[in-house]
């Protein structure tokens, strides 16, 4: 069966063999899929738990590894490791979009490569590992998979300001009229997602999304940068 083969393939990539494979299935299920399949569980609750497991694991690591770094600096470095863009990079390395269950409509609109969907799914997978194997296994998994990201954060090598990079490139080409416009938001107040259009050359070049307006703007800039590369 194709779904079973894909699950085994992802388990191999993660280096985790699940006792309860349904946890992984739920972690890989987007809400759009559940909307079309009413008995399917989707991954939002796992995202919530995975975020907490990730935050604690990274916090504990930084606290023990760097006893002379101030609380404020530790907070900044942790934020770099756990931000949506970093999570998306991890998910891309796993080719996570290939395994996510989503509606046909979501897939047609680019859901398999959408930053927020991939990032949320990474958190859900972490939660699935935590529930299946316990905290120590989940923590060791995080420290292994995020090793490069952690090191880059410590060495201040993570650059997340896509807006500035895009502005520099466009200004070098004589384009200065760059606008970010909030077009809508959706979801409950505690989990509100924002959508922002990026405009230049009198045209909408990309639409970004994120759980803050700033993240949505950065996502839009990141997508526009990829478009410039193509």
Swiss-Prot record:
Compartments annotated for it: namely:
Cytoplasm
Look at the named UniProt entry and state the broad enzyme category this protein falls under. hydrolase
Q: Which cofactors does this protein require?
A: Mg(2+)
Q: Where is the DRBM domain?
A: 161-230
Q: Which UniProt keywords apply?
A: Cytoplasm, Endonuclease, Hydrolase, Magnesium, Metal-binding, mRNA processing, Nuclease, RNA-binding, rRNA processing, rRNA-binding, tRNA processing
Select a single GO molecular function from the record's annotations and give it: metal ion binding
Gene Ontology annotations of biological process type:
mRNA processing; regulation of gene expression; rRNA processing; tRNA processing
Any GO CC annotation of this UniProt entry: cytoplasm
One Pfam family it belongs to = dsrm
Q: Which Gene3D superfamilies match?
A: 3.30.160.20, Ribonuclease III domain
Give its E.C. classification number.
Answer: 3.1.26.3
Q: What top-level branch of life does the organism fall under?
A: Bacteria
The record's catalysed reaction(s) read:
Endonucleolytic cleavage to 5'-phosphomonoester
Q: Keyword Ion transport, does the record have it?
A: no
**Broad class of where this protein is predominantly found:** cytoplasm
Q: Which residues bind Mg(2+)?
A: 47, 120, 123
Instruction: Name the active site residues.
Output: 51, 123
The similarity comment for this entry is: Belongs to the ribonuclease III family.
**Summary of the function given for this chain in its UniProt record:** Digests double-stranded RNA. Involved in the processing of primary rRNA transcript to yield the immediate precursors to the large and small rRNAs (23S and 16S). Processes some mRNAs, and tRNAs when they are encoded in the rRNA operon. Processes pre-crRNA and tracrRNA of type II CRISPR loci if present in the organism.
Q: How does it assemble?
A: Homodimer.
Q: What is this protein called?
A: Ribonuclease 3
- What is the organism field in this record? Clostridium acetobutylicum (strain ATCC 824 / DSM 792 / JCM 1419 / IAM 19013 / LMG 5710 / NBRC 13948 / NRRL B-527 / VKM B-1787 / 2291 / W)
């Amino acid at each position: 069966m194709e779904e079973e083969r894909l699950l085994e393939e992802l388990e191999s990539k993660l280096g985790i063999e699940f006792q309860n494979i349904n946890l992984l299935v739920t972690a890989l299920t987007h809400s759009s899929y559940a909307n079309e399949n009413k008995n399917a569980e989707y991954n939002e609750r796992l995202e919530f738990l995975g975020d907490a497991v990730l935050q604690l694991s990274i916090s504990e690591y930084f606290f023990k590894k760097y006893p002379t770094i101030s609380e404020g600096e530790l907070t900044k470095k942790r934020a770099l490791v756990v931000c949506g863009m970093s999570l998306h990079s991890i998910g891309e390395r796993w080719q996570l979009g290939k395994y996510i269950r989503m509606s046909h409509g979501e897939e047609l609109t680019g859901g398999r490569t959408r930053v927020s969907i991939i990032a949320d799914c990474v958190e859900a997978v972490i939660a699935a590992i935590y529930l299946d194997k316990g905290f120590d296994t989940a923590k060791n998994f995080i420290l292994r998979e995020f090793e490069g990201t952690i090191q880059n954060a410590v060495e201040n090598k993570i650059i997340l300001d896509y807006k500035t990079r895009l502005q520099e490139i466009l200004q070098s080409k004589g384009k200065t009229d760059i606008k970010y416009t909030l077009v809508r938001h959706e979801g409950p107040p505690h989990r509100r997602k924002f959508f922002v259009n990026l405009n230049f050359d009198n045209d909408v070049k990309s639409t970004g999304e994120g759980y803050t307006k700033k993240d949505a703007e950065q996502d839009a800039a990141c997508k526009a940068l990829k478009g410039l590369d193509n």
